[in-house]
């Protein structure tokens, strides 16, 4: 694979890159080392498929990929994951994300899976944490986590430590680049400012767009009606989609974004087109999202038909993940009661 082809796979569908020239230099010389981290908090939802599809691109481009299950981060973020539940939820996340990657035809042998607690309690990491905290102001720590850490009027000190640890993870995972959603941007710029003060090099930061919620700006694990969980039943999917805003001819809604960022890319990956059936039984087939969007804007697709087909297609996509997870319901109950 040529350098140009690798760069195309690594950068396609990203919203922003910090350190693009360094990225080009590394890819022209050797394999890129990149990681994606996920804090162990609420149940993963379908928006997780966006970064997981990007991870497939990294693997296909020959990158050395690490996935971090940030168990300590989940506990630090205003107790989103109670300490007694963290390890159970970590097992849940690992099984679920591996199931989703298999659905996306990703070779799991090409990915290294790491728990934060495996290295974040080491003497070297702890001393680095003391060092970075000693030069970080409360203002910078709070600003860095503003889009990621739960914001409360009187935050716990633990939530202010969160961005510093995420910055240090780049060093202690020995990576060239960190990948995340554009909501991570303030943490990324914090890392780029503070790591050089500890005599560590700036890392590259790759950011994907955020998928909006069904009725909100962001799909969130803490807002049940904004999201579709990767384990939701067919009935639960329909119940949530039926309630979401969808005006005839108006493409600015959460459902259309799901078609754009999840349904079309995944079906294209599987070599399938998107088939929409209306209430009269007539079928339309679409190879590209743009064609689909144009038909919706022309009002050729009714919102009711959009919702019913979205529910069907989403169920078809996540069904293999759900079925794999249902083989170990005891693990699910231990993680989320």
UniProtKB/Swiss-Prot annotation:
Keywords: Aminoacyl-tRNA synthetase, ATP-binding, Cytoplasm, Ligase, Nucleotide-binding, Protein biosynthesis. InterPro entries: aa-tRNA-synth_Ic, Rossmann-like_a/b/a_fold, Tyr-tRNA-ligase, Tyr-tRNA-ligase_arc/euk-type, Tyr-tRNA_synthase. It holds the Pfam family tRNA-synt_1b. A motif ('HIGH' region) lies at residues 40-48. Its EC number is 6.1.1.1. It comes from the Eukaryota. This is Probable tyrosine--tRNA ligase, cytoplasmic. It comes from Encephalitozoon cuniculi (strain GB-M1) (Microsporidian parasite).
């Amino acid at each position: 694979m040529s350098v140009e082809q690798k760069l195309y796979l690594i950068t396609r569908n990203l919203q922003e890159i910090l350190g693009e020239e360094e990225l080009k230099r590394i890819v022209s010389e050797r394999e890129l080392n990149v990681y994606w981290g996920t804090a162990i908090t609420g149940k993963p939802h379908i928006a997780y498929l966006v970064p997981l599809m990007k991870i497939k691109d990294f693997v296909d481009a020959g990158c050395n990929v690490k996935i971090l299950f940030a168990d300590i981060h989940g506990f630090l973020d205003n107790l989103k994951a109670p300490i007694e539940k963290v390890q159970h939820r970590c097992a849940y996340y690992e099984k679920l994300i591996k199931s989703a990657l298999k659905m996306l035809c990703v070779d799991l042998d090409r990915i290294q899976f790491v728990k934060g607690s495996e290295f974040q309690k080491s003497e070297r990491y702890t001393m680095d944490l003391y060092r970075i905290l000693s030069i970080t102001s409360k203002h910078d720590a709070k600003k860095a986590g503003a889009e990621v850490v739960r914001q409360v009027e009187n935050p716990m000190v633990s939530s202010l430590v969160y961005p510093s640890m995420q910055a240090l993870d780049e060093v202690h995972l020995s990576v060239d680049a960190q990948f995340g959603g554009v909501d991570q941007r303030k943490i990324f710029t914090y890392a780029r400012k503070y790591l050089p003060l500890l005599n560590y090099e700036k890392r590259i930061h790759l950011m994907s767009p955020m998928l909006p919620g069904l009725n909100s700006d962001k799909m969130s694990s803490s807002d049940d009606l904004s999201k579709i969980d990767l384990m939701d039943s067919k009935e639960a999917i329909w119940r949530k989609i039926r309630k979401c805003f969808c005006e005839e001819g108006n493409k600015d809604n959460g459902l259309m974004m799901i078609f754009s960022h999840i349904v079309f890319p995944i079906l294209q990956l599987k070599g399938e087109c998107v088939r929409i059936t209306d209430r009269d039984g007539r079928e339309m087939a679409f190879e590209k999202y743009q064609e689909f969007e144009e038909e919706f804007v022309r009002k050729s697709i009714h919102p009711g038909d959009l919702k019913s087909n979205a529910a069907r297609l989403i169920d078809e996509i996540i069904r293999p993940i759900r079925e794999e997870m249902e083989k170990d319901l005891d693990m699910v109950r231990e993680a989320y009661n």
